[in-house]
Design a protein with these regions (language model features):
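Short, contiguous alpha-helical
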Residues: 6-53, 89-157, 161-172
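Exposed alpha-helical structural elements
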Residues: 33-34, 62, 73
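Residues that form generic nucleotide/phosphate-binding pockets
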Residues: 37, 66, 77
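Proline-centered turn/helix-capping motifs that create local helix->coil transitions or kinks
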Residues: 42, 76-86
Length: 172
């Protein structure tokens, strides 16, 4: 993630109103929401996953420190609580009552999908070869989307500008 140039962090991504900075935050906010729910019984809501940047993340170092803190927190949780937890227990989240296994799985593939997007952005938009390449075997057993970008056409466009473009070639 540190390979994204600081000058590009606030550039808006193709096809959606989110910057590189917001995407990086979102990647780590997803497991933070999971951990907060698991450890503190904080409600697991759609709004919590909107990943609105907090004011405390003033610069890139704050963002990278946040990411490292979440990574270490997750590793500690897994070592101390997670690996022995009964993930078949029910979890009540914004999309219904599911098992903790399903919530953890969704956390993994959701953040993983956004990591795939960062890798694609580095290569295709920033012309940077990622120092660490994501191997698809990392996601073995996870229900990863087939497309890295939700709409491959939108990825080839310029940054999202908030305007809906009509395709005049489609007639009713």
């Amino acid at each position: 993630l540190k390979q994204i140039p600081v000058s590009k962090l606030d550039v808006i991504l193709p096809g959606r109103p989110r910057s590189y900075r917001q995407l990086i935050y979102h990647i780590f906010n997803i497991p933070e929401v999971f951990l907060n729910y698991f450890q503190n019984n904080t409600p697991y809501t759609y709004e919590a996953l909107l990943s609105i940047l907090p004011n405390k993340l003033k610069d890139e170092n704050d963002l990278y420190d946040y990411a490292e803190d979440i990574k270490l927190r997750f590793e500690s949780w897994w070592s101390n609580e997670g690996k022995n937890f009964d993930f078949s227990k029910p979890a009540n989240v914004y999309y219904g009552e599911v098992s903790f296994h399903e919530v953890l799985e969704r956390t993994a593939w959701h953040s993983g999908q956004h990591c795939r997007q960062v890798e694609l952005l580095l290569k295709e938009k920033l012309n940077i070869i990622p120092k660490i390449a994501l191997n698809e075997s990392l996601f073995y057993g996870l229900p990863m989307p087939s497309n890295i970008w939700d709409n491959e056409r939108s990825f080839s466009e310029n940054s999202y500008d908030g305007q809906v473009k009509e395709d005049l070639s489609i007639k009713e």
